[in-house]
Every structure is written in C-alpha cells, then in structure tokens.
Amino acid sequence: MRKEVLPPVLSTTTVCFEKKPIIATLLALSLVMIVWNLPPYYHNLISTARPCSAVTTTTTTTLLSSSNFTSAENFTTSLSTTTAAASQKYDSTPSDPNKRVFQPFGNAAALFVLMGAYRGGPTTFSVIGLASKPIHVYGKPWYKCEWISNNGTSIRAKAQKILPDWGYGRVYTVVVVNCTFNSNPNSDNTGGKLILNAYYNESPKLFERFTTLEESAGIYDESKYSPPYQYDYLYCGSSLYGNVSASRMREWMAYHAWFFGDKSHFVFHDAGGVSPEVRKVLEPWIRAGRVTVQNIRDQSQYDGYYYNQFLIVNDCLHRYRYAANWTFFFDVDEYIYLPHGNTLESVLDEFSVNTQFTIEQNPMSSVLCINDSSQDYPRQWGFEKLLFKDSRTKIRRDRKYAIQAKNAFATGVHMSENIVGKTLHKTETKIRYYHYHNTITVHEELCREMLPNSAKKKVTLYNKLPYVYDDNMKKLVKTIKEFEQKKLGTDVKNFS
C-alpha cells in the first residue's frame, strides 16, 4: 500500500519571502512586454513609406554614398537607415530652444507614376508616366536607364526626359523618358528587363529604382520595327469621360470604320465615358477586331490636365508606334472628311514626305436644323441633320493631326513638337474635319433651333455668329448606313 508523504511544514514568514520575488519578477516582465509592444511614435512621424495602389512593378528607394557603382546589388542603402537616423533626431531634445524642427507627414505627389514602357526599336525604349509637377518646375529630377539581361549581364543607357503637356499639367505633369542604348541590349534574345532610376534632384544619392518592362526569352522580333505594318491607319482616342451618347458613338464609329477601311484599328480610352450603352454599340466592332477599349479609370487618382489627356495620347503613340503607317489623333465629336473627291490613299501618299500634318476644322452648329416637315429628325443621325457651319474666317481654331509614329518621341493633343522630319499645315484643300462641338453628351433631340428653308441659300446669324448651309456630310449618310449594315448586320431603320 502506497504511503502518503506529508509536505514539510513551513512558516508563514518563509512563504511570503518566496512569493514576493516571483510577483516582482512577473510584474517586471509584464512591464517590459508592454513597452516592447508600444508603437514607435516618432518612426511613424517620419515614415517615408507610401501606399501602393495599382502598382505592379518592384520599387526600391535607394541612397547612394557615391555616384560610382558597379552592380544593382552594390549601390543600394535602404532608406530605412535614413529614417532611423531621423527618428533619433526627433527623439532627442534640441539643445537650442529656438531651433525649430520640421516634421513631414505623408506625400503630396509621387516622384513617378508609371503607365507603360515600350520598345521603340532595336536600341530604344520609351517609359511613359506622370510625375510631381512642382519637382519638375522648381527642381532638377533626372533619370537613368539600365537593362539587366537574363544571362546575368547589365548595360546602362542615356536617358532623355520630355515633358510634352505644354505646361498644362496640374499636380502631375506628363513625362516621357527615352532610353537609347548603343546597341540592342537583348541581341542574344535571352530576355531581360528595363530598369529606371528616377532621381529626386541633382544629387545622385536619393532615387527610386523600379522595373518598367520585361522581355521574355525569344520574344524579340526585329521585323516588327519595319514595314509592312499590321494596319494602314490607327486611331488613338483621348480620354473618354462624361455621359457620352451611345447614338453619337455608333454614328462616329460606323463613319470612320468606313472612312479608314478594313486595314485600320481604333483604340479608345475609358475614363468613365464608356457606359454599358456605349459599350454595347462598340462591342460588335470589338468582336470584329476593329476596336480596343482600354480601361484608364484609375487615372482619376492623379490630378493631371483634362483626364490626363497628354498621358493617354503619349502612351497610345508608343504602345502602337509600329502598328500602322499613320496614326490619327482627334475626338469623337469630329469627323474626318476629304473634299473635292480626294481619296485618303492619294492624300497620304502626297503627304508621306512629312512626319506629321495638321487638319483644319469645319465648326458646325450643335442646334440648328432646317424646318422641314418631310424630315423625320428623331430617326436621323447627328451629322445627317446638323448642316450649318460657322463661316467666320481668319480666326485661330484648334487643329487635329496625323503622324508617322515611328518618327515621334512624344506627342500632344493638337500636334507633336518632338519629331524627326517635317510638319505640314497647309492641308485644307486635301483633308478637313467636321466638328460637332457640344453634341457628344446630348441624349435628347439635337435639332433645337429650326431655320426656314431659305436659310440654305444665305448667311444666317445665330447668337451673333454667321452660319452657312453645308450638306457634304449628309450626302454620305446612305453609304455609311449601308456599310454598317453590311459589316455588322445592324438594322439601321429604327436608329435614333
């Protein structure tokens, strides 16, 4: 039988003596744990980390002790080192009570917002993005390009920055960085990636380093950079925004699909203007391979000029640089027209010695129609019934343009100032465009002011502006509707 062993008898004094050190130890440990887990207050004050929304590239903020470096691994010192040093500065009490400390919180604008990067030929690349406008206006940021090959080698290149938005930028301005190497950095076709260093100022010590483009092994094809190209003509549309009329988009698309022919392609950029109704009228053309719609709605996070128009047209220019012989830039309330029986092929053949040409507009009224009871206006297309042209001359009007993209480094909304080659402006007898301003977002009936039939033969003053009758576009409507029906099988009889 197992015997119970009684515990030794201890006095109360001894128990208390042993318990007190244990309790003190536990309290001390608890206090240490609490202090350990407190958030680093001053570290938060000076943290340079920023949220990364919709960024897919790897970014490293680096600090250089010298501008001479040999490899990607050797020339980075984490910015956290500087952050820690700054934390110590804020933690210490200034010895001089009159010395003020400036503590930054957050970031007002990014140093660089990458939209796209594209190979521009065997030895050149273009990186397109946004950058803080104050930095470029008041500072001297600069860039450096590097190609890191999959075979382990690397090569650096000169970088030239272009600011193509004519000073219209707001918080952000558009930046196109051209990287030109002495030879093809992927000549062995093993693949690699293009790295961009974006410097904050003249000093080479602080910059952001990120990947802009990657080429897989075997993907490089030099034949893509010389004719024949995939298309004869490419349309690069600006940012589509607002409450766009699906009817106006359908008319515009049918007309220009006919005008440019089967070897053409249209690129639209949806900044909020491609509603389900607009998407529905574009969908048949998308399925036919004639249209691409790119979703750029996230551009609204970056305050640039007019829905970042300059950013969008530059991205389109470089993305499709070798896709077509000619790239056209104009809006969806504008219709390209060839007067005097000209053909597009003959006109562009004549203009081919120029890198770009600009196009003069015929400004049309958005409200004036003929009061004709025989016309069923609600069923007619916009350019079928808006037939009055502003007849003022010798005033400056905005022009649109077409460009041989292979010879352009950057572009604008109305023309490019960064090209190799000549620009032709005297084109009005060969090609023009009809501009139906203030119609693209009108969903109700366009004919809101009626003029008598006699207005066809005289000048009409409306809102103190002279208008004359011009039915050149109306004469094409039957042809365009038949073309649309043939291409898409669309019943246009009930079109409104």
UniProtKB/Swiss-Prot annotation:
Topology in the lipid bilayer: Single-pass membrane protein
Domain GT92: 232-464
Parts of the chain that traverse the membrane: 22-42
Tagged with keyword Iron: no
Protein name per UniProt: Galactan beta-1,4-galactosyltransferase GALS1
Enzyme's top EC category: transferase
Additional information: Plants over-expressing GALS1 have a strong increase in beta-1,4-galactan content in leaf cell wall.
Cited function: Involved in the biosynthesis of beta-1,4-galactan. Can transfer galactose residues from UDP-galactose to beta-1,4-galactopentaose in vitro. Forms specifically beta-1,4-galactosyl linkages and can add successive beta-1,4-galactosyl residues to the acceptor. Beta-1,4-galactans are abundant polysaccharides in plant cell walls and are found as side-chain of rhamnogalacturonan I, which is a major component of pectin.
Record's keyword terms, sorted: Cell wall biogenesis/degradation, Glycosyltransferase, Golgi apparatus, Membrane, Transferase, Transmembrane, Transmembrane helix
GO biological process: cell wall biogenesis; cell wall organization; pectin biosynthetic process
Knocked-out gene: effects: No visible phenotype under normal growth conditions, but mutant plants have reduced content of beta-1,4-galactan in leaf cell wall.
Species of origin: Arabidopsis thaliana
Tissue specificity of this protein: Expressed in root vasculature, mature leaves, trichomes, flowers, siliques and seeds.
Cellular component GO terms, alphabetical: Golgi apparatus; Golgi membrane
EC id: 2.4.1.-
Coiled coil: none
Family: Belongs to the glycosyltransferase 92 family.
Localization terms from the record: Golgi apparatus membrane
Top-level taxon: Eukaryota
